[in-house]
Amino acid sequence: MRWQGEGLLLDAKRYGETSALINVFTVSFGRRVGLVRGAFNKKNKVAIQPGNQLFLTWNSRIEESLGTFKVELIKSRYHIISEERIGLEIFNLIRVLCSIFLPERVDFDDLYHKTIMCVEGEHGIKEKLKRYVEWELQLLTSLGFGLD
């Protein structure tokens, strides 16, 4: 089994000496967790930062197994997110909520695009908070708890 696509890195945890388990939110494949071998070498170390947009290649023998990722950096957002406190707090909320509430391997295209809009760009505090509230409403709608 193999697929390729774009995704937002939510979290990376060290696994062994050189590998990492990454949690990504992808455009067409939903939230996925997989192993990146050599995650902390010179090539991948820059890409494996929360908030970065990655091109992912996922390989596995069968669909249900963990699988391995090969990653390529599309856009680095880590430095933009960590510049000011409110942006970092909003991104951390998004990471945690996606990791907890989104089931694995379920497609959430609308929420993915709203997430990118919320994380991306340099806006004032009011605009960032407005985008975050809109994102949370989209999360609730995507999970079936939308407001009328």
For the regions a language model picked out, list residue spans one by one:
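Non-catalytic alpha-helical scaffolds and adjoining flexible linkers that form interface surfaces
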Residues: M1-A20, F25-D148
